[in-house]
């Protein structure tokens, strides 16, 4: 009588071995996160110089260079000179200086302001790897090149709010007002919410602690938040708002998605500029759309 072949017995790992495998997998994930974290934080668009120049021409922007002739961003002087003030823009991840022409259009549509847009290292055709350190160094260089005799305002969006907050805290006496669009209180808190099982506070190198930098700034800070923002949930912006002790104003868009402010009408920018320029120190004024 033929006997049916016996099935191989399944290998059953002991509990200590299973635990060891879980620990090894967790450590591997942590190592990968530490090694590739900047690839997750920064997703720069990269273009040739020829394409950048072509897009800049279409957007009515011109190259902004430092004293050595190196590319540091884009600019658009006010069509009506002399300009009343200067606005420096720090954009969000995945965007670029050319991609901020809509801010120049909106702001110059209601005010005679010169617009300067910082380009981050590694973005468009600017050389260098992006990191918190390189972005801050680029911001320092660019800010110090702005005209000193006019009021300077900062507009930051998403990741760029970390750069704008750094500038506000570093050059507090030179900055007349700030607008932060879809901001976070710190990238550490935002990352921790995305990866709650990982020791983010130990792994993260680029922390962008906006709330810390703004402690050194006492000027006017406007904050625009979108209620349906899934990239930077508005709770992180509210943390930044409530933690700021200076004069502030909130624009809340309950149905808005990430950085949807770009579609706001001229009245929004008129309100922002009026808030910046008013002599009365308004504290914690809220406006909903």
Indicate residue ranges for each PLM-predicted region.
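An N-terminal hydrophobic leader/cap segment in hydrolases
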Residues: 19-64
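Membrane-embedded segments
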Residues: 70-145, 162
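Short alpha-helix in the alpha/beta-hydrolase fold that links the catalytic acid
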Residues: 103, 210, 219, 233-242
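Gly/Ala-rich beta-loop-alpha elbow adjacent to hydrolase catalytic centers
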Residues: 156-164
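Hydrolase active-site cap/lid region
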Residues: 163-219, 260
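Short beta-strand/loop motif that positions the catalytic acidic residue
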Residues: 217, 222-229
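Acidic catalytic loop of the alpha/beta-hydrolase fold
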Residues: 227-232, 258-259
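Catalytic histidine-centered segment of alpha/beta-hydrolase-like enzymes
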Residues: 256-267
